[in-house]
């Protein structure tokens, strides 16, 4: 089993913590990670685009002039698509872009990005993040002690609302619960900071 340094909240070392090789030592699969990122981004799309077809645009439904005898081309309605202001043919309609990859593929994708963090030495494990009050300055001090200056994804155990509130005003920090860790966030943020409890929860879910 691989292991990484376990840090205290003040940035000092507190021994080592073992990592489950089935999660943290997987050969990263870039193709699967790409598919997972595209899936998540597609699921975030609003899909509210819409245009009016010939039944929705304003205008009369009667023939603009009689069929024969005028010398002009025959027309059935001023709402036809060839008219200025007429309806759009085969235009976009509201739809959901969400879809799901197979569960095994999604699990391989999250394991791949987590393993990549270990390979890049971008994984930081802290024995706990406990604050008396939700103060942004206090959380910034913790990051300074851990020597984290890059964008950071902080994964907390359930119920740690004080730490989550302390970090939410920091521009380069995002906080998610252990159950909410996902491929897109891990890819978007350089550093991955886990509490020891969050690490255990992730390994329970993915093992």
Curated annotation (Swiss-Prot):
HAMAP family: Ribosomal_uL4_B. Gene3D superfamilies: 3.40.1370.10. SUPFAM superfamilies: Ribosomal protein L4. This is Large ribosomal subunit protein uL4. Part of the 50S ribosomal subunit. One of the primary rRNA binding proteins, this protein initially binds near the 5'-end of the 23S rRNA. It is important during the early stages of 50S assembly. It makes multiple contacts with different domains of the 23S rRNA in the assembled 50S subunit and ribosome. Forms part of the polypeptide exit tunnel. Belongs to the universal ribosomal protein uL4 family. Disulfide bonds: none annotated. PANTHER family: 50S RIBOSOMAL PROTEIN L4, LARGE RIBOSOMAL SUBUNIT PROTEIN UL4M. It comes from Lacticaseibacillus paracasei (strain ATCC 334 / BCRC 17002 / CCUG 31169 / CIP 107868 / KCTC 3260 / NRRL B-441). One of its GO terms (cellular component) is ribosome. Keywords: Ribonucleoprotein, Ribosomal protein, RNA-binding, rRNA-binding. GO terms for biological process: translation. Residues 45-78 are annotated as: Disordered. GO terms for molecular function: rRNA binding; structural constituent of ribosome.
């Amino acid at each position: 089993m691989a292991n990484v340094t376990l840090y205290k909240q003040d940035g000092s070392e507190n021994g080592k913590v073992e990592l489950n090789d089935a999660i943290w030592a997987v050969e990263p699969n870039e193709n699967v990670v790409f598919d997972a990122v595209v899936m998540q981004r597609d699921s975030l799309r609003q899909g509210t685009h819409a245009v009016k077809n010939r039944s929705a645009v304003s205008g009369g439904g009667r023939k603009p002039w009689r069929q024969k005898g005028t010398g002009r081309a025959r027309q059935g309605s001023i709402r036809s698509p060839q008219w200025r202001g007429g309806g759009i043919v085969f235009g976009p309609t509201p739809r959901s872009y969400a879809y799901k990859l197979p569960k095994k593929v999604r699990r391989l994708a999250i394991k791949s990005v987590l393993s990549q963090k270990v390979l890049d030495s971008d994984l930081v494990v802290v024995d706990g993040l406990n604050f008396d009050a939700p103060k942004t300055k206090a959380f910034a001090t913790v990051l300074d002690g851990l020597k984290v200056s890059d964008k950071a994804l902080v994964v907390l155990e359930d119920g740690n609302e004080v730490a989550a509130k302390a970090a939410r005003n920091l521009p380069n920090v995002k906080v998610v619960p252990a159950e909410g860790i996902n491929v897109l966030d891990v890819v978007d943020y350089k550093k991955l900071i886990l509490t020891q409890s969050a690490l255990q929860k992730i390994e329970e879910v993915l093992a």
